[in-house]
Design a protein with these regions (language model features):
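Bacterial N-terminal signal peptides that target proteins for export
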Residues: 2-14
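Bacterial N-terminal signal peptides
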Residues: 12-23
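Tandem repeat scaffolds
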Residues: 29-235
Length: 236
């Protein structure tokens, strides 16, 4: 009996030791914050704020929870990178490629996404108030439940994108284009700038949304909806 117990304890101890080693290796890999920027790098939860990372290749990288506050990521390859819950406040991703990237639940106030190619990216539940998406390719992007107050979409391509349940208060879509229907189901349109926008093929729009938005005589609406007698906004 004593020998069996000793062997059992020895085996249990070995298993525990192996588990500890694997756990340590996984933790070390997750905290590889000193690794250079490279495709597939694992920077999860690392501090990368106030850095110049312009032109880097971070395709497929694990960037979950990274602090990129005020970091320069312009002209970078962010293809399929995972930025979930990352902090990108006042960072710049201008002119970067981010097709299929994950930006779920990021914190990105006043962030520069201008001219970014983000086809098929996900910004679900992201906080991107006052951010700049001017001239960006946002086709088939998911902005479901995103906070987009005062965001700028001048001349952006938003074809096929989804803004359902998003907060678009004072967001500016003037000059935006789309060749495939976009979904505005129950999005908050308080003083959203839609002057000159052809929304005739958009989906999910209701009269109550238009009544609080800012359009003009050139704004085209889906069938069954009408222009308010007076749009709320009269100044640019």
């Amino acid at each position: 009996m004593t020998l069996r117990r000793t062997r059992a304890y020895g085996t249990s101890g070995l298993v525990l030791a192996v588990c500890i080693v694997f756990a340590w290796q996984n933790a070390a890999a997750a905290q590889n914050c000193d690794a250079a920027a490279a495709p597939g790098v694992n920077w999860q939860d690392c501090d990368k704020k106030l850095l110049i990372l312009k032109g880097q290749d971070l395709s497929g990288a694990n960037l979950i929870g990274v602090d990129f506050t005020s970091t320069d990521l312009r002209n970078s390859n962010l293809l399929a990178a995972n930025f979930e819950k990352a902090t990108l406040v006042r960072a710049s991703l201008a002119d970067s490629t981010a097709k299929g990237a994950r930006f779920d639940k990021i914190e990105a106030y006043r962030t520069d996404f201008s001219r970014m190619d983000a086809q098929g990216a996900v910004f679900a539940s992201a906080e991107v108030q006052r951010s700049n998406f001017q001239d960006a390719n946002l086709t088939n992007v998911d902005f479901t439940k995103a906070e987009l107050g005062r965001a700028q979409f001048h001349d952006a391509d938003i074809s096929g994108s989804r803004f359902s349940f998003a907060n678009l208060a004072r967001a500016d879509f003037r000059g935006a284009t789309f060749t495939a229907p976009i979904d505005f189901d129950r999005a908050f349109f308080f003083q959203t700038r839609i002057e000159g926008l052809d929304l005739s093929k958009s989906a999910g729009l209701s009269q109550w949304q238009l009544n609080m938005a800012c359009g003009d005589a050139q704004t085209e609406l889906p069938s069954g909806l009408t222009r308010p007698e007076d749009w709320p906004c009269s100044e640019p």
